[in-house]
Design a protein with these regions (language model features):
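Positively charged n-region of N-terminal signal peptides that target proteins for export
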Residues: 1-5
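Bacterial N-terminal signal peptides
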Residues: 9-17
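Bacterial lipoprotein signal-peptidase II cleavage site
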Residues: 18-31
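Short, glycine-/small- and polar/acidic-enriched structural segments
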Residues: 28-161, 165-168, 177, 184-190, ...
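Short, solvent-exposed loop/beta-turn-alpha elements that line the ligand-binding surface or hinge
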Residues: 61, 134, 210, 276-284, ...
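Pocket-lining segment of extracytoplasmic ligand-binding domains
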Residues: 87, 93-95, 124, 162-257
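Secondary-structure end/capping motifs
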Residues: 225-301
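Conserved C-terminal helix/tail region of periplasmic/extracytoplasmic solute-binding proteins
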Residues: 292-316
Length: 316
């Protein structure tokens, strides 16, 4: 009887030891540092949640390092993505189509929430879109900016071929040329659009008014396959930043946002924060509208459906 009791005690001790060792192994495994993610952003409000997440330490809380690279033009951003200098980027559906058309696979992992406005210069004497015929509009060609410009102009029953588009890829340069009267109008993202308004520009229309926003977050196929846990961590941090933005006033974070994003100082008095929501996916309808525009301009002949060029698993 005593032998049986001793044997039982020994078994229990060994079992506890094994469980303890297993727990330690699991703990050590789960605490392994995640790989670094590098993402590209533009000078717009789509980037704000990522800047907040980095500054407030939300990425670190999720066990991830995120390097944020700032770009002034979509072409520079796309070149960096193709060269492997960044893993993902705040982008748009047009770029996704172009990348995949050229056999460089990228995946949409969520939509982004920015705002774009068509602004007329202070001395242009343009107060409505109908007066844009024969006038110059600063854009970046074959990007979300040109897409939105066309949609905005056509919403007023104006033939977009009757306006003079001027390709100005770098957004700060476009803003400067508008303010200096070198172009009559420009399509700009917020918060730079509000900067133009504060300088005397006038809002003719906006993506918000039309209810369209083809902005998306994308990652390369390699990143999606090799950094899935890191991307999930990024989105958990992103949602923490959204909560912060909903609860805090801009005065509490405007200083470091101006510094980190490279926004002009005038943004301090004009920043209007969108009503951000937790990470979610774009719709099939939004993709179809982009494809129709691209096909009309003979920029693609391919048909895509959202599930083939996206991965929603990171935000679930």
């Amino acid at each position: 009887m005593k032998k049986n009791i001793l044997l039982l005690v020994l078994v229990l001790i060994l079992s506890i030891g094994i469980v303890g060792c297993t727990s330690e192994v699991k703990k050590e495994t789960s605490s392994q540092p995640l790989k670094t993610l590098t993402i590209g952003v533009m000078p717009d409000l789509d980037s704000l949640p990522f800047i907040i997440a980095e500054h407030n330490g939300y990425f670190k809380e999720e066990g991830i390092q995120v390097k944020i690279e700032h770009f002034k033009s979509a072409s520079d951003r796309d070149t960096a993505l193709q060269a492997g200098k960044i893993h993902g980027a705040i982008s748009d559906m047009l770029s996704v189509v172009f990348f995949n058309d050229n056999k460089f696979e990228v995946k949409i992992t969520s939509k982004t929430e920015g705002s774009f406005k068509l602004i007329s210069g202070k001395d242009s004497n343009i107060s409505k879109i109908e007066q844009s015929v024969g006038k110059t509009i600063g854009i970046s060609k074959n990007t979300i900016i040109e897409y939105l410009t066309d949609r905005i102009v056509e919403s007023s029953k104006i033939d977009v071929n009757l306006v003079k588009k001027v390709a100005i890829p770098k957004i700060p340069t476009r803003l400067e040329m508008l303010n200096n009267g070198k172009i009559d109008m420009a399509t700009l993202p917020e918060p730079l659009a509000s900067t133009a308004i504060s300088a005397g520009g006038k809002v003719l229309s906006s993506s918000d008014k039309l209810g369209i926003n083809p902005g998306v977050m994308i990652f390369t196929k390699d990143a999606v396959e090799s950094k899935s846990e890191e991307i999930k961590s990024l989105y958990r941090a992103y949602n923490k930043a959204i909560k912060f933005l909903k609860e805090e006033k801009p005065e509490s974070y405007i200083d470091f946002v101006i510094k980190e994003a490279g926004f002009p100082e005038s943004v301090r008095n004009t920043l209007t924060v969108p009503n951000y929501s937790d990470a979610s996916m774009p719709t099939e309808k939004e993709l179809t509208e982009v494809l129709n525009w691209l096909k009309t301009k003979k920029l693609t002949t391919n048909n895509y459906i959202l599930k083939d060029i996206s991965n929603s698993s990171f935000i679930k």
